[in-house]
Design a protein with these regions (language model features):
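Extracytoplasmic
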Residues: 6-39
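Residue-level signature of mid-helix packing/kink "hotspots" within the transmembrane helices
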Residues: 22, 50-58, 142-143
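Helix-breaking motifs and short loop linkers at transmembrane-helix boundaries and internal kinks
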Residues: 36, 68, 89-95, 106
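Conserved MFS/SLC helix-loop-helix module at the cytosolic interface between two early adjacent transmembrane helices
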Residues: 55-91
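Paired small-residue
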Residues: 83, 94-102
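Helix-loop-helix hairpin linking two adjacent transmembrane segments in secondary transporters
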Residues: 95, 133-157
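Cytoplasmic helix-loop-helix junction between adjacent transmembrane helices
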Residues: 99-137
Length: 157
């Protein structure tokens, strides 16, 4: 039963990471208006994020192979949080882009370790449950995270 708390934490983490990934999609028009640019130019924020995750995954994982998984997960969450705060405080598009690349780096490592970590904390008889819970965080982010993120973004500005 001890595995439930970390597993729920990992599920919530997948929700937060994916909501963060999807949120700019719902706010693209507002981002473009805030930085006085076209929506297609602001859309590079989403494309560069996706490319950064793809390109950084393998090199970053090669750099952190010796870091214990729990410490690595906590470090990734700290990096993610700091870069999200920098995103919120961005005064221009390029600062926002740099912060989002930092989030993408955290995202790349997060998705490389979260599923094996979920299976590791659960008893072997509950491995499929652990994987489905982590996957549920993604589904809930798509269904509720994106619209809630849009509402939050519009409310805060």
């Amino acid at each position: 039963m001890r595995f439930w708390v970390p597993l729920v934490g990992m599920t919530l983490s997948t929700f937060v990471f994916n909501t963060s990934e999807f949120m700019p999609i719902g706010l693209l028009t507002d981002i473009a208006a805030d930085f006085n640019m076209t929506e297609s130019a602001a859309g590079m924020l989403i494309s560069v994020y996706a490319w950064a995750v793809m390109i950084l995954s393998l090199p970053l994982m090669l750099c952190v192979t010796k870091v214990p998984p729990k410490r690595l997960l906590l470090g990734v969450i700290v990096l993610f949080s700091i870069c999200q705060l920098l995103s919120a405080a961005s005064v221009n598009f390029w600062m926002l882009m740099a912060a989002r690349i930092g989030v993408a780096a955290a995202h790349a490592v997060f998705w490389s370790i979260i599923t094996p970590l979920a299976v590791r904390v659960a008893p072997s008889s509950k491995a499929s449950l652990a994987l489905s819970m982590v996957g549920m965080g993604t589904s809930v982010a798509m269904i509720f995270g994106l619209p809630c993120g849009r509402m939050l973004g519009l409310a805060i500005g």
